[in-house]
Amino acid sequence: MKRNISMSLQRLLIILMMISFLFTSLLVPSVSATNLNTISTCLINYKVSNFSVYPTRNHAGNRYYNLLDFSIQNLRFAASSKPKPTVIIVPESKEQLVSSVLCCRQGSYEIRVRCGGHSYEGTSYVSFDGSPFVVIDLMKLDDVSVDLDSETAWVQGGATLGQTYYAISRASDVHGFSAGSCPTVGVGGHISGGGFGFLSRKYGLAADNVVDALLVDAEGRLLDRKAMGEEVFWAIRGGGGGIWGIIYAWKIRLLKVPKTVTSFIVPRPGSKRYVSQLVHKWQLVAPKLDDDFYLSISMSSASKGNIPIEINAQFSGFYLGTKTEAISILNEAFPELGVVESDCKEMSWIESTLFFSELDNVANTSDVSRLKERYFENKSYFKAKSDHVKTPISVGGIMTALDVLEKEPNGHVIFDPYGAAMQRISEEAIAFPHRKGNLFRIQYLVVWKEKDNNNIAKSNGYIEWIREFYNTMAPHVSSSPRAAYVNYMDLDLGVMDDYLMLNTSITASADHAVERARVWGEKYFLNNYDRLVKAKTKIDPLNVFRHQQGIPPMFASMPEHTYSSK
């Protein structure tokens, strides 16, 4: 009897060990020692020394995990259960960046490219297809070189928005740049998806103000605008990040700003009826305001215990001018908002970027050196979705939306106004297409903490809630297709069921990939999708740079390629 029990325990232990081994192998895609030695030797031969290999039992992993975790902004993808890269490479020059790509190719590794790590779905540092992958992290490629004579700047792909803003402000107090409000976002990915911000109604997106770029392609070539060709240059501006090659640097156009701008954040909490009426008026006003004015809304639910008590509506305003001018414009166009002089603060443009940032303790907007901080303190677990609105939503429709919002205290919804320059620029000017006819963009967001993430039912509940919110809004937003913003990536829209690896040339498979990607591609890029497929086929016919929601090439036209290293 004892012997039978002992044998049963032994079998159980063996089974548990096998399960543990299988689970671990799923997290770190299997890679042969030969492949690992190949890429390590290749990197060393190319004098790339700043890299870290996934830790084994005989290799301490502190440096690896410090590198990996530093720029993971969505903690959903930092969990031990998520796949991990075999190697993390941190190139420190364009030569090392080129070498990193060639070594990954030689070792048959998938490549993930990370700039600031703000990918909403973790696609810059996670791969879910089971293949060994490498993260090329651009954090050391963060130089910003400003040339006031030409009113341009070369910005390396690993620089953050905050570093870029700070460098511009050190060179001039009458120049700025049109991009997002979160200073730790990397410019490489942000501009690749378009890049919307407080100056976008005046000057368009970040990508609208790119005049040249340096792109490392899958063959290790460093291509400028002329060398890559106009179609590829068009595609990399708004066509999404991580799928064309690696942006070594953007050449951006500096934009004129006055020495004094006005900023305000005014809370307007109240009942659903009160907030609905304010929001209804906002959507009629904000897209039609002067080009110099930006006015957005952020809403969440306040509750006492589990009982909703009111909706918190927060209006963020930015004006390229004095507060007297700003208040005069608002009093005429939107008196219901009730903004008064004491709500407004006059400051420089660079101070406004800190004022609207998500950095902690920014009451002192004169300490703009904080914009250079690369580490984002307010990391969280989150899920987001997006929409575009073409016709005003009725008060009843807004009330319905707030009915869903009040169910989840961790939920948020943000309305960003379009119009002005966003209305005038052609939807074909760059790959980002959401222009004329769009009143505003919606971002749905739900954020939670680690204790809730450890509770599967709770974390799944947050995801279910945001999907419910999204479904509820369907009658009120764009349709055929229901448009989305690629920088707010949402894998719910669909994923590639396979990445159609390097050795396929079957037209049927190519057609399948292109049509499969159309499901999300037309939501992000509307009528620009097919043009993006052609650009992808030109610059990356082997689909080396890919992720779950990439743009596939037309494989039937693939050329033969051979690659070698030292």
UniProtKB/Swiss-Prot annotation:
A Pfam family annotated for this UniProt entry: FAD_binding_4
Main location: other
Modified residues (Pros-8alpha-FAD histidine): 118
Cofactor: FAD
Disulfide pairings: 42-103
Top-rank taxon: Eukaryota
GO MF term (any one): oxidoreductase activity
Job description of the protein: Involved in the biosynthesis of pyridine alkaloid natural products, leading mainly to the production of anabasine, anatabine, nicotine and nornicotine, effective deterrents against herbivores with antiparasitic and pesticide properties (neurotoxins); nornicotine serves as the precursor in the synthesis of the carcinogen compound N'-nitrosonornicotine (NNN). Catalyzes a late oxidation step subsequent to the pyridine ring condensation reaction in the biosynthesis of alkaloids.
Family, per entry: Belongs to the oxygen-dependent FAD-linked oxidoreductase family.
Protein name: Berberine bridge enzyme-like D-2
Annotated source species: Nicotiana tabacum (Common tobacco)
